[in-house]
């Protein structure tokens, strides 16, 4: 099982918070911490509700390199969703192991093709994919598709696990509150769980209230290990 603690913007632009999130994620047993690398003016209009907060959480190249180094020092994998070619170049320079294509980028053909050309493994959220089946991504690396509902937060009734084949969807990008949905997805065969992670749900920002806190991350990791034991497999890593 692969557990991804999605830091996203939950560092609020504060590198010390970002580093603490990395350390705590490692202590609680996550396999990967993931960030979002973007130019806010390319993805959000100035009147977007959370524009100011997204701008403050926008990481520079130097900050990305520092955080990737911090991940290496504590022994957890650094990964990211990159939203443009400039930031793809940053992550290639630091030798990032695998990429995440976010739901909002699923139709950005040039970006996807450039990511695919790296030959690295790719995880793809399908929350905004409108076609039947799966998008075609030509790459030498492995492609894992994640079931996702692009609604924040996702309500339990928005999920459709009975019609999700987790032998084809490798995992679940979970935007529900709590960890119940992730546990059900794992029991149904998901091998990858990605979920937003925060130090404190009461912190200010768009994603904190719907994120898992350190205790929930620890529970998710422990239960995932038990589910692996019960199902008799240890995959994804």
Describe each region flagged by the PLM.
Residues 1-237:
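Catalytic cores and adjacent flexible loops of soluble metabolic enzymes
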């Amino acid at each position: 099982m692969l557990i991804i603690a999605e830091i996203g913007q939950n560092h609020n632009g504060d590198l010390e918070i970002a580093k603490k999130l990395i350390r705590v994620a490692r202590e609680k047993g996550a396999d990967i911490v993931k960030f979002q690398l973007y130019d806010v003016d390319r993805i959000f209009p100035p009147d977007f509700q959370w524009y100011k907060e997204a701008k403050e959480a926008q990481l520079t190249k130097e900050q990305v390199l520092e955080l990737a180094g911090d991940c290496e020092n504590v022994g957890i994998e650094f990964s990211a969703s990159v939203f443009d070619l400039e930031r793809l170049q940053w992550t290639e320079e630091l030798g990032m192991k695998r990429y995440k294509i976010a739901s909002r980028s699923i139709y950005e053909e040039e970006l996807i093709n450039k990511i695919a050309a790296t030959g690295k493994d790719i995880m793809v959220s399908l929350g905004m994919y409108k076609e039947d089946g799966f998008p075609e991504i030509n790459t030498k690396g492995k492609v894992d598709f994640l079931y996702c509902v692009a609604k924040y937060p996702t309500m339990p009734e928005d999920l459709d696990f009975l019609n999700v084949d987790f032998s084809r969807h490798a995992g679940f990008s979970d935007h529900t509150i709590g960890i119940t949905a992730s546990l059900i997805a794992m029991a149904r065969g998901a091998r990858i769980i990605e979920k937003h992670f925060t130090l404190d749900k009461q912190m200010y920002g768009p994603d904190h209230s719907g994120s898992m806190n350190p205790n929930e991350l620890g529970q998710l990791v422990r239960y995932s290990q038990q589910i692996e034991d019960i199902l008799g497999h240890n995959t994804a890593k």
